[in-house]
Amino acid sequence: VTTYMVRPARGVSVRVFNRHADDIARSLMAVSVFVQAPVPGTDTVGIVIPNHNREIVNFREIASTETFREASRKMALPLIVGKDTTGRPYIADLAKMPHLLVAGATGQGKSVCLNAMLTSLLLEKTPDELKLLLVDPKRVEMGMYEDESHLVHPVVKEVQDAKNALNWAVHEMDERYTRMSRLNTKNITGYNQRLASLQGKLPPDLEDLEPMPYIAIVIDELAALMLQCRKDV
């Protein structure tokens, strides 16, 4: 899509644009238009028009932008999602979500999107900073990651193994909450920063604590997994 930003003349209500959306689409020979009136934080109205020809979003191009480099400095787990309607790179922080569902019809690019986001994590985070738990019941989507040193476990391909892996993740989560409470911190970033500041000065009862990497759990075909073992996952 392409977004046009329009600043109404003084005295013109933004409601006018919604009322005349069909006329705008006809004048632009577009199938339809979406009117965002107003664009939050601005004095403009956004008119979003579907492009006749789709633009290919290049991963390398976005990964090379200053936008991604800056996001990587500020975000704990930067994900390259794509571009927004104005053509600017769209980067999201998985650590702030912290859950993400990628949905769509067959052949619409769900796996491409997922691989792009995984690649952006691997590009920026070392195995000491990030671990991955990959669940691939179809056995065909995540084989390329088999040799990655970021894996906390080989790619999980069996349903029973998936249940065990998720149970391990729940146990690990509880253990991490206990460790964070011992340092009076609320999240992984705060825990690691606090631990680093105490290096060489840790009291004896905290000497067993070690830095914690993030753990990202990625499940391909979640619906199929839930159909097979809904009660367990």
Regions found by a protein language model. Give the residues of each.
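P-loop NTPase motor-domain active sites and their immediate coupling elements
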Residues: V1, G11, A21, T42-I91, ...
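Intein modules and their embedded homing endonuclease domains
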Residues: V1, R7-V45
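Flexible beta-alpha connector loops of hexameric P-loop NTPases
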Residues: A9-S13, A103-Q108, E148-N167, T178, ...
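P-loop NTPase switch/communication element
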Residues: A95, L122-Q160, N164-A165
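Conserved beta-strand position immediately N-terminal to the Walker
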Residues: L100
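Hydrophobic positions on the alpha1 helix immediately C-terminal to the Walker A/P-loop
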Residues: C113, M117
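Alpha-helical transmembrane segments of multipass membrane proteins
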Residues: S120-L121, L225
